[in-house]
Amino acid sequence: MRIAIALFNLGGPDGPDAVEPFLFNLFSDPAIIRVPGFLRRFLARTISRRRAPKARGIYARIGGGSPLLPNTLAQARALEERLRDLGEVRAFPVMRYWHPMTPEAVREIAQFAPDRIVLLPLYPQFSTTTTASSLDAWREEAARAGLAAPMRTLCCYPVEAGFIEALAALVRDGVEAARAKGRPRILFSAHGLPEKVVKAGDPYQWQVEQTAAAAMQRLGDIGADHVVCYQSRVGPLKWIGPDRKSVV
């Protein structure tokens, strides 16, 4: 049996020249900026031009581009190895805002001609701005390509045991390393959202807080307090908080 696993992720620029178009793709998404199309494209162009120079400087500190695709490819190969007893399994990165983007990934999966397709967003917490946006784009492109194989979606796992164990292990190592400088405090920092998105029913903030609570429970009496905070605020709207900068 041939099984294709679509690994959905945000994507990231692979070099300095990709930063501005990546940002434009991001802010052009109606799930991100919820205004009419003509205005959204204008705002996306304006925001991406303004933010690109600073973003290039940040990416320059880590080699000029995002490590997200190489890391996702490593996950894909590891997943294939773990599942090889199930048959011919291939995992395909499906990036939302930079290559390989959804149309490219759909074509590659169609060429693989799978008997089944598993849709696996790599976002532990569900949001209309991430998981839903990726799956909507997938459905549109898959229908256009005529992908007829049965599909199953594995969606959101904010308190899945393996995920929490891995997160807690990383936090534990960080806390122990920080003790040399004093009493540590744990900041669970997640990407923020406009408050109106959450008030409209998006479960993201609730699931982020579930993740943090589960990790702290797994850590037990670690001798450090914690706070959940949010980062990457953009624009004039009120965002969920507390903001990471104010917490720091």
PLM-predicted stretches and their roles:
Residues 1-248:
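Active-site-proximal alpha-helix that buttresses catalytic centers in soluble enzyme cores
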